[in-house]
């Protein structure tokens, strides 16, 4: 769920096609760990 939330935050922030690195950066900014396996699915 946190991956989807981070993806949507990036999208709402103006990034029309957030990458896995963008999502990972958002999660790292709040101290959450990114599951690499699920992150690659995006």
From Swiss-Prot:
A Gene Ontology BP annotation from the UniProt entry: cytoplasmic translational elongation
Record's keyword terms, sorted: Phosphoprotein, Ribonucleoprotein, Ribosomal protein
Designated name of the protein: Large ribosomal subunit protein P2
Species the sequence originates in: Triticum aestivum
InterPro entries documented for this protein: P1/P2_N_sf, Ribosomal_P2
Biological function: Plays an important role in the elongation step of protein synthesis.
Record-annotated membrane-spanning stretches: none
Family, similarity comment: Belongs to the eukaryotic ribosomal protein P1/P2 family.
């Amino acid at each position: 769920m946190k991956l989807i939330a981070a993806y949507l935050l990036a999208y709402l922030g103006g990034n029309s096609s957030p990458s896995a690195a963008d999502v990972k950066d958002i999660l790292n900014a709040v101290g959450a760990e990114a599951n690499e396996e699920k992150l690659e699915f995006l």
